[in-house]
Amino acid sequence: MSQESETSASMQPVTKRAAVAIIIDGDKFLSIKRSRTVRAPGKICFPGGGVEPGETVEQALVREMQEELGIAVRPIRFVWRSNSVRGFELNWWTAEIEDGEVITPDNNEVESFKWRTQSEVVSDPELLDSNADFFAAINRGEFEV
């Protein structure tokens, strides 16, 4: 099965890589509401961000979780790759929060966070398109988390 997808037919060329963290507790996914000062303000999505020069995707995932949520995570498994309409190659990884870590969002990047079931996430009208595409790919059986 394919682990790659395009999120729009009218996409820009891929110019930058990004890491997306899929963090699950039971049947709930960790989702964030993006702050009003970042790209796609107020949108609901999984945490993540750009890969810096010299970083691997896994290193970027760890760094972004520390920056956005103040937590140490352990990348577990690459599950999917997609391309955003803004020209990002999105690398979707499952990850686990290290024991004893407490989520403390950086309000400059994250307005709030919430643990939600898949149906709660996909029914949110503010869901970022790339996250809707992620759940659609799961429902098509392209991969499992």
Task: Tell what function each PLM region has.
Residues 4-30, 50:
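Conserved N-terminal beta-strand and adjoining loop/helix that marks the start
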